[in-house]
Structures are given as C-alpha cells and as structure tokens.
Swiss-Prot record:
Gene Ontology CC annotations of this record: cytoplasm
Keywords of this entry: Cytoplasm
Domain of life the protein comes from: Bacteria
Organism of provenance: Staphylococcus epidermidis (strain ATCC 35984 / DSM 28319 / BCRC 17069 / CCUG 31568 / BM 3577 / RP62A)
Region (Disordered): 53-78
Protein name per Swiss-Prot or TrEMBL: UPF0291 protein SERP0911
Gene3D superfamilies (alphabetical): Helix hairpin bin
Classification of source organism: Bacteria, Bacillati, Bacillota, Bacilli, Bacillales
Length: 78
C-alpha cells in the first residue's frame, strides 16, 4: 500500500473515531496534519495535471486559455 493510501486510511479511521468517541488532543493534531498533507499533495497533483492540459474544440482548434499557455511556455523554457 502506498503512503498516500495509508494516510487516507488513517484520516478515515480518525474521522470514524471522532464521530463515535471523540479524539484526544494528539489524535486531533494528527488528523489536522494528515489532512493538510493530503490536501497539499492533491493540489500539487491537480496543478500539474492542469498545467499539462491542452484544450481542443470540436473543429480541432487549440482553445487553451492564454494564461495556461503562458504557464506551459514558461515551464517548457526552463
């Protein structure tokens, strides 16, 4: 199992425990930390995916937003 899956499993485990019994201070801090890490990784992956996307209309024209084209160009020139 990947580290990400283990983190999701632990986040879910802590969420269930919070609903059923509540969390200790340490568990609440762990939950916050794991959620923050998960969101950070999710956002990073999503940003990479968007930055590598090209939008083509039904006629085959590149209609990628200019802002995205500029970001892609800057990354390509590095």
């Amino acid at each position: 199992m990947s580290k990400e899956n283990l983190n999701i499993d632990r986040i879910n485990e802590l969420a269930r425990k919070k609903k059923e019994h509540g969390l200790t201070n340490e568990e609440a801090k762990e939950q916050t930390k794991l959620r923050r890490q998960y969101l950070e990784e999710f956002r990073k992956g999503f940003k990479q995916q968007i930055e590598n996307t090209k939008v083509i209309d039904p006629e085959g024209n590149d209609v990628t937003p200019e802002k995205l084209k500029k970001i892609q160009e800057e990354k390509h020139n590095k």
